Amino acid sequence: MNPGDAQSIDRRCVRRSFDASAERYDEVAVLQREVADRLLERLEPVRVHPRRVLDLGAGTGYATRGLLRRYRKAEVHAVDLAPAMLQRVRRRAPWLRRPRCVCADLHALPYPDDSFELVFSNLALQWAEDLPTALRELQRVTAPEGAVMFATFGPETLHELRGAWAEVGDQARVHRFADKHDVGDRMLEAGFVDPVLDGESFTLTYAQPREVMRDLKALGASNADPGRPRGLLSPHRLARVEAAYRLAWRQPDGRVPATYEVVYGHAWGMGGTPQRADDTGEVRLDVHGIRRRRR
């Protein structure tokens, strides 16, 4: 994938969408919690003892609370673009040990150079308007011996929905995501040392295609491309999209899949050797619960 193949992002649209979804976000963020848990597990072999930790794109604070438990002596900062998300972080934080909540754009973080020994980001980088700039900011605030650990979405994410829209002549309704090779190249250009990227595929299953779109809206994961189609979607056009989705992807049990390709990345600020995670396969999931593949 070339850098220009990924869609551009309207940051104001991203902020509005996540602000609007904050109250319902935790009800539907099944995949986001699972990926956060796996990303937190990947910290176990990484030899860092941070004084300060950055949770970038903290959302409602699920991973923030995991970081507080793991690094009990560290000062944890929860950063998000959406103020309503940070209100949820504050509301759910431990009374005796609250994170520092900062509303900020990941393209211009309000911190000095080398501020954090650990930068953690769960499913936020895909919303960067300019990925190279965002990665340079992450590198800038990472201490020389600090580690960066993140997860983002890859290009196979929601390919079923994208294909259904293409069948009715509209490919711009579903966001396109950068692949791991492009992300790795951008990390090297940003100055990270020895970036390692791998990934795995998750499949959520739904009773109807409309439920896929309903969950995306509840998550705030709307298409933020400035060139996206505007205006209300007609019932007739929505019915055509659903029919195309079912025709191509309906499973024997009548449910339809929604695939998410998750790319994991980790590196060091200026030195050290990150630990490589184990290889993983595909995991199939019901929207009401996650079943982990036995290894």
Swiss-Prot record:
Enzyme class at the top of the EC tree: transferase
GO annotation terms (biological process): biotin biosynthetic process; methylation
MF terms in GO: carboxyl-O-methyltransferase activity; malonyl-CoA methyltransferase activity; S-adenosylmethionine-dependent methyltransferase activity
Q: Which Pfam families match?
A: Methyltransf_11
What is the recorded function of this protein according to its Swiss-Prot or TrEMBL entry? Answer: Converts the free carboxyl group of a malonyl-thioester to its methyl ester by transfer of a methyl group from S-adenosyl-L-methionine (SAM). It allows to synthesize pimeloyl-ACP via the fatty acid synthetic pathway.
Q: Does the keyword Zinc apply?
A: no
Name used for this protein in its record? Malonyl-[acyl-carrier protein] O-methyltransferase
- Pathway membership of this protein? Cofactor biosynthesis; biotin biosynthesis
Which reaction(s) are listed as its catalytic activity? malonyl-[ACP] + S-adenosyl-L-methionine = malonyl-[ACP] methyl ester + S-adenosyl-L-homocysteine
Annotated family: Belongs to the methyltransferase superfamily.
EC number per UniProt: 2.1.1.197
Keyword list (alphabetical) reads: Biotin biosynthesis, Methyltransferase, S-adenosyl-L-methionine, Transferase
InterPro entries according to UniProt:
BioC, Malonyl-ACP_OMT, Methyltransf_11, SAM-dependent_MTases_sf
Specify the superkingdom: Bacteria
KW Mitochondrion (keyword) present: no
The UniProt entry, under Gene3D superfamilies, shows: Vaccinia Virus protein VP39
